[in-house]
């Protein structure tokens, strides 16, 4: 692996983050053959925020106008991709305030809220309400884990005011939640 001067590394670091704002400090450290701490110091020197803040910024700029059914700041987790009426993806980092103190396991309502708000966000109408939800918690989620929720909209049925959204939440490649959300939707008059 080529060793870069500090100046060259910082220039290439800036380009790498511009090309992929979702790249982690660990991935950058591996890419440039330096420690994670060196990458963090480079980011601070270049005034580049940490991954979490970059994701929030990209999501708020990119998806704030796309999501019609609820304000973007009411979505639980951060939307990283959305195609209205088709699919959406969000991430949620489980922190100490989301877990039971005695066993560090995430409270189920946080997983449900991420899945439900993603199912709501993918609906292209101003009014989107959950009429029914069937949720199965597959395994517990622990503090420090990142949940990636993926929503897929089923093709329309006879009742055009009801849409079914399937949501699967993952930690890594492991499914932690499966949900089927029946969504009523309408345009505000």
From Swiss-Prot:
Gene: fapR
Entry's family note: Belongs to the FapR family.
Single GO MF annotation: DNA binding
Identification of the protein by name: Transcription factor FapR
Keywords for the protein's UniProt record, in alphabetical order: DNA-binding, Fatty acid biosynthesis, Fatty acid metabolism, Lipid biosynthesis, Lipid metabolism, Repressor, Transcription, Transcription regulation
Highest rank taxon of the organism: Bacteria
Keyword flag Lipid metabolism: yes
Function of the protein: Transcriptional factor involved in regulation of membrane lipid biosynthesis by repressing genes involved in fatty acid and phospholipid metabolism.
GO biological process assignments: fatty acid biosynthetic process; negative regulation of DNA-templated transcription; negative regulation of fatty acid biosynthetic process
InterPro entries attached to this UniProt entry: HotDog_dom_sf, Transcription_factor_FapR, WH-like_DNA-bd_sf
Organism per entry: Listeria monocytogenes serotype 4a (strain HCC23)
